A protein has these predicted regions:
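Non-heme Fe(II)/2-oxoglutarate
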Residues: 1-72, 78
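Extracellular structured ligand-interaction cores
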Residues: 4, 67-68, 78, 89-93, ...
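Non-catalytic surface loops within mature trypsin-like serine protease
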Residues: 11, 96-98, 169-171
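A general structural signal for short secondary-structure junctions and capping/turn motifs
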Residues: 60-64, 82-86, 134-136, 155-158
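Short, charged, solvent-exposed linker or helix-capping segments at domain edges/interfaces
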Residues: 60-61, 104-107, 176-179
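Catalytic core of non-heme Fe(II) oxygenases with the double-stranded beta-helix
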Residues: 73-143
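Catalytic core of Fe(II)/2-oxoglutarate
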Residues: 116-179
């Protein structure tokens, strides 16, 4: 199974524009002062209900959005090698801001234990250092990434914040990694 796969989504420019506008107008996450952790749920803001273009675009792939989160970074220390705490194989990441020259990297030999971020999001923190990078992708368009394996984000720290929208779908978007 591949670690990532780019996909085409119709209305991607509208999705990106509405997502950024939503974050600016309805959340504090564009400001560094509000930073408590990189992975932030948009469920309390009813984001998916306010951006129907996401569901319309995913429907063409036989997918239905279940959850929307953002991954916000201000520097490379904001992300570490980890596995997402989820039953999902993959999520769809959509670049929203300052993603040029940044990479999602994938690793083998990752050992981990469950932790909870200050944002309340659980994840699997890596407990070893002898993991091996096996792949990487620049998130420049909607991309399914394999979140059940070890991964990390490396960013260009001169362009902040770096923000991706990350979508959990039914059926699992990770199943498309084999196509």
């Amino acid at each position: 199974m591949s670690y990532w796969k780019r996909i085409e989504l119709k209305n991607i420019d509208i999705i990106k524009e509405k997502s950024l506008e939503f974050l600016k107008m309805h959340t504090p996450y564009m400001m560094k002062e509000s930073f408590k952790g990189a992975f932030i749920s948009l469920a309390p803001y009813r984001f998916l209900q306010k951006t129907p273009e996401i569901a319309e675009s995913l429907e063409e792939h036989g997918l239905f959005p279940e959850d929307a989160n953002i991954y916000v970074m201000w520097n490379n220390k904001d992300s570490v090698v980890h596995k997402d705490y989820t039953d999902s194989i993959g999520r769809i990441n959509i670049p929203l801001l300052n993603c040029e020259g940044t990479y999602t990297t994938f690793y083998e030999n990752v050992h981990s234990r469950r932790l909870v971020l200050p944002t309340g999001a659980p994840f699997f923190m890596t407990t070893n250092k002898d993991y091996i990078e096996v792949d990487r992708v620049e998130i420049m368009q909607p991309t399914i990434i394999k979140v059940c394996d070890g991964h990390n984000v490396l960013m260009d720290e001169t362009k902040v914040p770096r923000i991706t929208l990350t979508l959990t779908c039914t059926p699992d978007a990770g199943l498309l990694l084999d196509d």
